[in-house]
């Protein structure tokens, strides 16, 4: 009986620790089309600096890091970097914390020709 209680406590503690690691989730990007140098605003949840360490634009083969100009829990602003090629690109985050992960987000932006 005591053993099952201890196991239950350990499981509850591990689930609580896991739940505290909030995962970033992007829900929209404005504008949906842009050119190099344009400012882009991404909205979502858990976008603060401790959960989103870096932000990339990716076509699935080439990842281009963007320079974040403003960042809060619900919004990230960045400029489209000169290295971006025209096309439809996904946003991808590098999470913060002890075990960083690259996570492609369900939002995309189209980079137009100059």
Describe each PLM feature range.
Residues 1-5:
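Positively charged n-region of N-terminal signal peptides that target proteins for export
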Residues 10-19:
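Hydrophobic h-region of N-terminal signal peptides that target proteins for export
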Residues 20-114:
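Ser/Thr/Pro-rich low-complexity tracts
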